[in-house]
Amino acid sequence: MFDAFTKVVAQADARGQFISTSEIDALAAMVSGRNKRLDAVSRISNNASTIVASAARELFAQQPALISPGGNAYTSRRMAACLRDMEIILRYVTYSAFTGDASVLEDRCLNGLRETYLALGTPGTSVAAGVNLMKDAALSIVNDRAGISNGDCASLSSEIGTYFDRAAASVA
């Protein structure tokens, strides 16, 4: 996992060049938006159980076969595993949002996840639907202007959305 600064240095070094003005400008913009990033990560982290619970509730309302006898989330043990997995994905999305880099999400969470779900017989489309529901809930919290640093959060919200999109695509 590399933070944005380390990644820029590594890329410049690989090219055998100095860090470009455009790279410096991009990093400066990232630093100036750091408070918004911290606010967003804090909000998602502080509301993680609500995000997971509301996404799960909506997922099971949309796909009741999951919680019916024989469903992948039937029995409290399987339900707990489902909620745990949703929480883990959300946690790694916050790590990526915090660092501004998806590699931690890709390397430590998503790598091999589809294969694991296939081996367990868990429908990837249902997992992807759950991730998308978490995305909706998390972005709703992030985009709530009350008590957040002044400024436009559209690009940050879009970035966070891409982390959820990566997670959903990796299991679908």
Curated annotation (Swiss-Prot):
The entry's localization annotation reads:
Cellular thylakoid membrane
Q: Does the keyword Acetylation apply?
A: no
Instruction: State where it is primarily located.
Output: membrane
Q: Which domain of life is it from?
A: Bacteria
* Membrane topology recorded in Swiss-Prot or TrEMBL: Peripheral membrane protein
GO CC, alphabetical? phycobilisome; plasma membrane-derived thylakoid membrane
Q: What does this protein do?
A: Light-harvesting photosynthetic bile pigment-protein from the phycobiliprotein complex.
Entry similarity comment: Belongs to the phycobiliprotein family.
Protein name per the record: R-phycocyanin-2 beta chain
Q: Which organism is it from?
A: Synechococcus sp. (strain WH8020)
Q: Which gene encodes it?
A: rpcB
